[in-house]
């Protein structure tokens, strides 16, 4: 099927490189990669033409997701992340209510208070992110055959003893 590109030999080198980047991402987060097993559960290609856009969504069935830009022109749409929780919102509604800006309370929209974050990506870039992050692509762009390879990854404990919040090793699962 189209959701298992990682099983296609033509993509084996690319996916080996992506795996290295995923390991770096995990280490960057301070996670001991010796204690977990990492599974790529799905991987697929998306071709975008014209004004097509990907609506905001999450990959709730996995832990880590990625998008690798195999083909991308400067005019093609970028990936966008949507802030659902407004972690820096110290006053309720200050970042979402238009009157706060109109009334001069909020002086500017910036990286720390924006509802959406547009990540400028170029061809051969990869974006790795938590699967729970709400994301999509920009609208009103003229895509010229943008091709991205995306995938989902699951992290499982090698030894789940005394761990409440990790999935136990797959070899201990029982199919019902």
What are these regions (language model features)?
Residues 31-43:
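A short coil-to-beta-strand element that immediately follows conserved catalytic motifs
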């Amino acid at each position: 099927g189209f959701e298992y590109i990682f099983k296609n030999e033509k993509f084996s080198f690319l996916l080996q490189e992506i795996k290295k980047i995923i390991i770096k991402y995990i280490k960057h987060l301070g996670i001991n990669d010796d204690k977990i097993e990492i599974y790529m559960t799905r991987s697929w290609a998306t071709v975008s033409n014209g004004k097509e856009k990907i609506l905001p969504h999450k990959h709730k069935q996995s832990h880590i997701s990625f998008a690798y830009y195999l083909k991308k022109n400067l005019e093609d749409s970028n990936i966008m992340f949507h802030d659902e929780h407004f972690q820096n919102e110290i006053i309720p509604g200050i970042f979402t209510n238009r009157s706060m800006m109109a009334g001069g309370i909020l002086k500017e929209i910036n990286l720390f208070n924006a509802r959406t974050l547009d990540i400028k990506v170029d061809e051969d870039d990869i974006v790795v992110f938590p699967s729970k992050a709400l994301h999509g692509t920009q609208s009103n762009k003229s895509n010229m055959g943008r091709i991205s390879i995306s995938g989902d990854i699951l992290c499982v404990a090698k030894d789940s003893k005394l761990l409440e919040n990790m999935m136990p090793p797959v070899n201990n699962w029982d199919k019902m």
